[in-house]
C-alpha cells in the first residue's frame, strides 16, 4: 500500500476496518437518569484538573441508555460528571464513564478523550421505579433509583443544561510511554430535540472498587434527580488547553 494511500485512508484503527465510523454521531431516544448529589469538596478539588475550577461540591451520576446511535449501535453508559467553570463559563467535566460497547469506547477515547472503560451498566424501568446500575465485572459499584415520572421537569432548565459546554481530559501516550497528547477538550451537544423530562424522589448508593473508584466521591446528600429523553448529535471537540505546550 502506497504511503499516500495510507495517509488518505487513515482515520482510526485498524486501517482497513476502523473500530468506529466517521461522524456525525446522532443519537435517537437517548434516555438519561441523572442524580445530582453533594460530596466532599476537597476530594473534588483534588480530582478536577486546572484550569477547570470546581463550582460547588456537587457530582452528577449519570445512567444513559442509547438504543439507537449512528455507528455506535445500542449500548448503555454510566459514570460521574462534575459541574465546573472554565474562565467564567459554566460547564461539566466528565470524570469517569463505564459502558458495554467497544466502538464508543474506542471512538470516545481516541476522538474526544472520554475517560471510558468497559463495564456493565443498565437503565430500566421496574414497575414504578427507574433503576440504574453499574457493575464492574461481577461486582456492583453503583445503584440509582428514582420514582418514575412523578412530576414534569422545567424543560427550559433541562435544555439550558444540555446546551452547556462539556470538558474532557484527553491523554494519549507516545510509543515510549510518555504523553504525546495531554489536552483539555471542549465539546457540545447539538441539534437537541428534548422529548420529555421528569423529576421525582431519588436515591444513590456507591461501593468501593479498586478499578472503578466511583465511591471516592462519596454521596453525602442526594440533591435532585432528572429523567429525560432526547434526540441529539454528539459534536466533535476542540482543544482549549494544551498541558504539554511550553509556557
From Swiss-Prot:
It comes from the Bacteria. It catalyses: acetoacetate + H(+) = acetone + CO2. Its EC number is 4.1.1.4. SUPFAM superfamilies: Acetoacetate decarboxylase-like (SSF160104). The keyword Magnesium does not apply. GO terms for molecular function: acetoacetate decarboxylase activity. Keywords: Decarboxylase, Lyase, Schiff base. The active site is at residue 116. Belongs to the ADC family. Catalyzes the conversion of acetoacetate to acetone and carbon dioxide. This is Acetoacetate decarboxylase 1. It comes from Mesorhizobium japonicum (strain LMG 29417 / CECT 9101 / MAFF 303099). The lineage of its organism: Bacteria, Pseudomonadati, Pseudomonadota, Alphaproteobacteria, Hyphomicrobiales.
Amino acid at each position: 500500500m502506497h504511503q499516500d494511500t495510507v495517509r488518505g485512508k487513515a482515520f482510526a484503527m485498524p486501517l482497513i476496518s476502523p473500530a468506529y465510523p466517521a461522524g456525525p454521531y446522532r443519537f435517537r431516544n437517548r434516555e438519561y437518569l441523572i442524580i445530582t448529589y453533594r460530596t466532599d469538596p476537597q476530594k473534588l478539588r483534588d480530582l478536577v484538573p486546572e484550569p477547570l475550577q470546581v463550582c460547588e461540591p456537587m457530582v452528577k451520576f449519570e445512567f444513559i441508555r442509547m438504543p439507537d446511535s449512528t455507528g455506535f449501535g445500542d449500548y448503555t453508559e454510566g459514570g460521574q460528571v462534575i459541574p465546573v467553570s472554565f474562565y467564567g463559563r459554566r460547564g461539566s467535566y466528565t470524570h469517569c464513564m463505564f459502558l458495554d460497547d467497544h466502538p464508543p469506547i474506542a471512538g470516545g477515547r481516541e476522538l474526544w478523550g472520554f475517560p471510558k472503560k468497559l463495564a456493565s451498566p443498565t437503565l430500566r424501568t421496574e414497575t414504578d421505579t427507574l433503576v440504574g446500575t453499574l457493575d464492574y465485572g461481577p461486582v456492583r459499584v453503583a445503584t440509582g433509583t428514582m420514582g418514575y415520572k412523578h412530576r414534569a421537569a422545567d424543560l427550559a432548565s433541562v435544555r439550558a443544561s444540555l446546551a452547556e459546554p462539556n470538558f474532557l481530559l484527553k491523554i494519549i501516550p507516545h510509543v515510549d510511554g510518555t504523553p504525546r497528547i495531554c489536552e483539555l477538550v471542549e465539546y457540545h451537544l447539538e441539534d437537541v430535540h428534548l422529548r420529555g423530562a421528569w423529576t421525582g424522589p431519588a436515591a444513590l448508593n456507591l461501593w468501593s472498587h479498586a478499578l472503578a473508584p466511583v465511591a471516592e466521591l462519596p454521596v453525602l446528600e442526594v440533591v435532585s434527580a432528572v429523567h429525560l429523553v432526547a434526540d441529539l448529535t454528539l459534536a466533535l471537540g476542540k482543544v482549549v488547553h494544551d498541558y504539554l505546550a511550553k509556557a
